[in-house]
Amino acid sequence: VLFHTDLSRTGGISNGIDLDRLNWGNYDLVVIDESHNFRNGAGTHANTTENRYVKLMEKVIRTGVKTKVLMLSATPVNNRFVDLRNQLAIAYEGDSEQIDSKLATKKSIDDIFRQAQKAYNAWCKLEPKERTTDALLRTLDFDFFEVLDSVTIARSRKHISKYYSTAEIGKFPERLKPISMRPSLTNLKSAINYNQIYEELMKLTLCIYTPSNYIFPSKLDKYMDLTHNKGINLTQRGREQGIRRLMSINLLKRLESSVFSFNLTLSRIRELITKTIDAINRFEKYGISDLDTYEASDHDFDMDDGNTDFFTVGKKVKIDLADMDYRTWREELQADADILELLTLMIADITPEYDTKLQTLLALISKKIEHPINGDNKKILIFSAFSDTAEYLYENVSVFVKEKYGLDTALVTGTVDGKTTVKGLKATLNNVLTCFSPISKSKAVLMPSSTANIDILIATDCISEGQNLQDCDYLVNYDIHWNPVRIIQRFGRIDRIGSKNEYIQLVNFWPDMDLDEYINLKNRVETRMKISVMTATGDDDLINAEEKGDLEYRKAQLQRLQEEVVDIEDMSEGISIMDLGLNEFRLDLLEYLKTHPDMERKPRGLHTVVPATEEQPEGVIFVLRNVNNSVNIDNQNRIHPFYMVYIGREGNVICDYLNPKKLLDDVRLLCRGKSEPIKAVYTKFNEETDDGRNMAEMSELLSMAIDSIIDTKEESDIDSLFFAGGTSALMSDISGLSDFELICFLVVK
């Protein structure tokens, strides 16, 4: 087992493996966990030697023996289908001809994804009420579904809970309603509040990060060749503007996280400004003119921001102060320094004792320990986006918990070795997580002689993905990540199938303000700092908060997070891969045929009767077969030559044949756990049909089902005229009942 980051290392030991002696190209199978980290592909830069995706492709996939790839991800698609294509390209070594020859598609995989993205972009522009999953499914090409069915298997929490018997695989714990905390900054009298600090922050120019803005126009050419960006589409000025924007947003994030982290960042920026003003003063006095462009500290950014190209591409650039309007720059630097000084004074009195947010957390911990929600389970997992905040919490929480309850605490941040109050325990990541979640991490096997037990774990997002910590039943988001998906990923550490806990609790700490105020504030900062020269790689959000519709969407997301724990596929504005593929049904069918090999010999027209539900009303689901196998009515039916239609008792179409995924899901749900005829419903059906001798109503509904196929085909023909990929209007013609045979039907009563 190695880590994604090991791809960029040239030597050393990782997980007990000597990387100097590792033959990367010698593996027949590579399993990539959290594969969405590779979804951006090789990037658009000419110089991509440091790109982890390229390293994986060159060192592991293309080199040595033929390598098969299995990729695991909860979020394979962010808001572009290209994300999925980039991950698939790992499996076919970036050579599309390799996969094109294996797929039963008419177009190449590149064309398929290009058209899918085009359809998705058009769908995104629809009004929210029109932007349904069904609307997107109807515009996607048949070949796209063929690709998905060939290479993906998808399951979600909701899907497993709804369609699978959890008796065999274990159930998910019940999610309690999230607890929302909104502590003020401090309880000191006449102390400042969030809004007062925000007003001061809005006055900052943060020009310390944009020295290129002050280079004389006549001198700019001198730096065009010296900058780090030969062949790269991110200019030095664009890079500086990107860092400036991120730092502006980050000051808000740091304040939301903790007064301690905010104060550290203020100090770091002030120190940079002071050094720069001193350098300018020395130049005026002694003529020493070289100036390094200053980098922001890694500690000041959360994990998502720290991974943007502003930090990973290039190196420092030296600027000659003689080439700059340094006097203007110095004036603006001094103005920022004064604001930072004022902010520092504003929060100077907020020590841990008067830090209301910290004191609220300690009270919350006490309540959980004294009143567990599952038996005697005292475990609590606390997340922060920033390592500085996590360190601050550890220093205060560990002492409090040890002195009051005799329990042990640990810290993992990913930037430094972990810490723990357990004596004699080396605080490596594996040791800490094993002692925190001993059952899920098999502590009895890995550390049989250890009695160490950790009840409180404080962590950054370095463990928000890929870790099973389900021994814990209580998770605290000490700060609300600006990317809402992160919040759900964090909760996924304890919200897992087979958990020994009956209930799990999520606690979110929000800034002390109204949600509308909070959203508008974030928008003001993002809008103010949006620079057109910046490349798209600077965005740390799933959505662009400048568009009014997206602001409303962000508000709705955060509103939901206050009321419920949201599934990850529901939090994305786009489409879930769960809505698209049929692969799981094929696997179910193959499994069924192993124990029922005589399916081919079953007579046509078999039926059964099942109870209706709120979501599946009374009606009939027909399974038909087109007797002319060569005709795929509109080249869109993914289960051709079979056609499924769900018709209501009144002849209304509940679900047409273009959505077989929904129909198959409905059939599975209606029949799940039922292996014998259900007397309560079949008795009534037999009475109505004279024990099957009078099937007039069924015949009429069957005729309506076939009419619906023809009507849907005509609608689809018209639609196809407006989308890329050719029209289906001229492909075939069907006349009615004589084109189909009835395979079976499911009566819903």
Locations of the language-model features?
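C-terminal accessory region of SF2 helicases/translocases
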Residues: 160, 501-698, 706, 710-749
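Walker B beta-strand of ABC/ABC-like P-loop ATPase nucleotide-binding domains
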Residues: 30-31, 458
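Conserved Helicase C-terminal RecA-like lobe
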Residues: 170-188, 205-451, 747
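Walker B catalytic acidic pair
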Residues: 33-34, 478
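Switch/connector loops and helix/strand junctions flanking conserved nucleotide-binding motifs
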Residues: 9-13, 38-41, 78-86, 107, ...
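Conserved RecA-like P-loop NTPase helicase motor core
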Residues: 75, 353, 398, 402-517
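A short helix-turn-beta junction within AAA+ P-loop NTPase domains corresponding to the substrate/partner-engaging
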Residues: 84-97, 473-478
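Inter-lobe coupling linker of SF2 helicases/translocases
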Residues: 1-30, 37, 42-67, 71-74, ...
